[in-house]
């Protein structure tokens, strides 16, 4: 168990992530669904839609983590709820890593081999890549859940209180720790290495092209930085806890804090969507305009602000490039 003040901080962090991540991802979901319905959607939009769905899965399960943190990490809900929550929560995290890697590959190919990319890209490729990411994450996390809940008849407790996915028997640790190590290698380090290479080449090409405008260069750098932060800040601590746990043969005390950082990716991904797609930038712009209109209506200035905001939104829509791929060189 963590001290009460640490549990309170984790509780507040979960609430902030939920309140910021849910509306932003819902806006992105609406934008990507609209783009996918158009003829011949780009593979990157299918991957971005899948990443949005992974974030929403995590956010929809986050209330159970909030209840757990509010109870000082004692689990009072049914055991099956713990199993399903853990399965979906951690599957969404590891699905995101390979989806981010897939997006980085698509971006790199789009600028490194623009002609071949435009001629060969198919929506089916995005669907296959997304399915592979989901199957890999669900398959790996299913192993961990089965080990925890079906490989023992002993109910694991912390003192007199039941915990969720925190304490294991020695027999469970013999299987869980190697599986966690494999998760760390296959679903974190490999996709991170792929992503770093692709975005290093992507940014280098974008910055070295004289015909690429300053705005597109800034978006390229922003996309790479946000993705790198996702891996290092959000996913890094949690996967390092797997390495430490394998060495110490127990979960480190700070693992629950690392899980919070993993959840943070659901609030950070909307920034990635913003840098990646013009349809999301327009959707976010319209969402902000609605908030401005509501605020101005309370102040009696709705008419003027609405007219100005509409003109600005039209300007953004006209100034963007091809919606299929913002970074593909012509």
Swiss-Prot record:
Transmembrane regions listed in the UniProt entry = 13-33, 42-62, 85-105, 127-147, 174-194, 220-240, 256-276
> Which cellular component appears as one GO term in the record?
cell projection
Q: How does it sit in the membrane?
A: Multi-pass membrane protein
Report biased composition (Basic and acidic residues) as residue ranges. 302-315
Disulfide topology? none
Q: Does the keyword Plastid apply?
A: no
The free-text tissue note of the record is: Expressed at relatively high levels in peripheral blood leukocytes and, to lesser extent, in spleen.
Q: Where in the cell is it found?
A: Cell membrane
UniProt topological domain (Cytoplasmic) ranges: 34-41, 106-126, 195-219, 277-330
Q: Which PROSITE patterns match?
A: G_PROTEIN_RECEP_F1_1, G_PROTEIN_RECEP_F1_2
Q: Which residues lie on this side of the membrane: Extracellular?
A: 1-12, 63-84, 148-173, 241-255
Gene Ontology biological process: cell surface pattern recognition receptor signaling pathway; cellular response to fatty acid; fat cell differentiation; G protein-coupled receptor signaling pathway; glucose homeostasis; leukocyte chemotaxis involved in inflammatory response; ligand-gated ion channel signaling pathway; lipid storage
Carbohydrate attachment sites? 151, 167
What superkingdom does the record give?
Answer: Eukaryota
Q: Which Gene3D superfamilies match?
A: Rhodopsin 7-helix transmembrane proteins
Q: What is the effect of changing residue 106 to A?
A: Partial loss of SCFA-induced G protein-coupled receptor activity
**InterPro entries in the record:** GPCR_Rhodpsn, GPCR_Rhodpsn_7TM, GPR40-rel_orph
What keywords were assigned to this record? Cell membrane, G-protein coupled receptor, Glycoprotein, Immunity, Inflammatory response, Lipid-binding, Membrane, Receptor, Transducer, Transmembrane, Transmembrane helix
GO molecular-function term, one example from the UniProt record: G protein-coupled receptor activity
- Family as reported in the entry's similarity comment: Belongs to the G-protein coupled receptor 1 family.
- Report the function annotation for this chain: G protein-coupled receptor that is activated by a major product of dietary fiber digestion, the short chain fatty acids (SCFAs), and that plays a role in the regulation of whole-body energy homeostasis and in intestinal immunity. In omnivorous mammals, the short chain fatty acids acetate, propionate and butyrate are produced primarily by the gut microbiome that metabolizes dietary fibers. SCFAs serve as a source of energy but also act as signaling molecules.
The protein, known as: Free fatty acid receptor 2
Its source organism is Homo sapiens
Q: Which gene encodes it?
A: FFAR2
